[in-house]
C-alpha cells in the first residue's frame, strides 16, 4: 500500500518548515519473522532508504526476532493471576504473563491495565496472542528504546543512511472506542515537538502545546499496517521534516491525574 500525502502550509505561518510532500509506503514481502532473523537486513532488502527517512516497525516482529515469547504450557499461575482470570474470563496462565511483564497494575478488571518497565501503560502489558503460533504469546520488548537504537545503528552500518526508527504497538484509548498505533520506542528523533514559547496566529504565547509527533507517525503507520492478516509490519516514511523537542512523553507519577484517579478506585 503506497500513499502520497501533500501538505500545503503557508510559509508566513510562524516560519515553520514548509512541507511539500510525504510519501508513506508499507514494506511488503517480509517473511514470517522467526527467532534469530536479522530484521534490519530484511527491511533494507525490501526498501531503498535515504537520509532522514523514518521506519515504523511493529513491536511484534521485533519480539519474534528476539524471541520475546512465552509458552503458556510452561506458565504456572499464582493466586493473584487465578483470581483476576476468574473475573475477566481469561486464561490464568495468560494473566500470569501479563503480571510478570508489569511493574504496576492500575486496574485488574474488567481488563488489566498495567505499566511496563519502559513506562508504557496499556491493556494486559501489551501481551499478544495474535499472529503467533498456538500456545505462545508475544511480550513487548523490555527496552524498546534500545531496540530502536540497535536497528537504527545496524541500518546505518549496512546502508550508510541515517534514518529514524519508531517501534509501535497497537493500543486502546481512554474515552474512545478503537485502537490506534502508539510509539513505545524511537531513535533518531525526539518524541515531542515543543511549541511552548512560540506564538499563535494572533500573537498569543503558547504555554502548554506539545505535539506527540512519534505517536502521530505511529498512528498513521498503523493505518497502513492494518490488523488481522494484513501482513505489513513495517512502514517507510519519506519527507517528514526534522523537528526539535524532548523525550518526556510519559507523565511522571505525580503529574498523571488519571493514574491518581484509578488508584482510588
Question: What spans do the regions from the language model cover?
Answer:
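N-terminal and secondary-structure boundary signal
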Residues: 17-265
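Short, Lys/Arg-enriched N-terminal segments with co-localized hydrophobic residues
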Residues: 6-17
Amino acid at each position: 500500500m503506497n500513499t502520497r500525502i501533500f501538505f500545503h502550509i503557508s510559509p508566513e505561518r510562524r516560519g515553520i518548515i514548509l512541507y511539500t510532500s510525504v510519501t508513506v509506503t508499507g514494506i511488503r514481502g517480509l517473511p514470517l519473522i522467526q527467532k534469530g532473523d536479522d530484521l534490519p537486513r530484511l527491511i533494507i532488502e525490501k526498501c531503498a532508504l535515504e537520509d532522514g527517512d523514518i521506519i515504523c516497525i511493529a513491536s511484534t516482529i521485533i519480539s519474534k526476532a528476539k524471541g520475546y515469547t512465552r509458552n503458556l504450557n510452561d506458565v504456572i499461575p499464582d493466586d493473584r493471576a487465578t483470581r483476576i482470570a476468574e473475573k475477566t474470563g481469561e486464561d490464568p496462565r495468560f494473566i500470569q504473563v501479563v503480571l510478570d511483564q508489569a511493574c504496576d497494575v492500575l486496574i485488574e478488571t474488567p481488563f488489566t491495565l498495567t505499566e511496563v518497565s519502559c513506562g508504557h501503560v496499556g491493556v494486559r502489558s501489551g501481551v499478544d496472542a495474535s499472529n503467533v503460533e498456538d500456545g505462545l504469546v508475544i511480550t513487548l520488548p523490555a527496552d524498546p528504546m534500545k531496540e530502536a537504537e540497535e536497528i537504527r545503528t545496524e541500518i546505518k552500518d549496512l546502508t550508510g543512511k541515517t534514518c529514524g526508527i519508531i517501534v509501535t504497538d497497537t493500543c486502546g484509548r481512554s474515552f474512545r472506542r478503537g485502537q490506534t498505533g502508539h510509539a513505545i520506542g524511537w531513535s533518531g528523533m525526539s518524541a515531542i515537538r515543543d511549541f511552548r514559547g512560540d506564538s499563535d496566529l494572533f500573537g498569543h504565547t503558547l504555554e502548554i502545546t506539545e505535539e506527540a509527533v512519534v505517536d502521530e507517525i505511529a498512528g498513521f503507520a498503523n493505518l497502513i499496517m492494518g490488523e488481522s492478516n494484513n501482513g505489513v509490519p513495517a512502514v517507510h516514511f519519506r519527507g517528514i521534516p526534522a523537528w526539535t523537542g524532548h523525550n518526556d512523553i510519559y507523565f511522571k507519577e505525580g503529574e498523571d491525574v488519571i493514574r491518581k484517579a484509578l488508584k482510588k478506585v
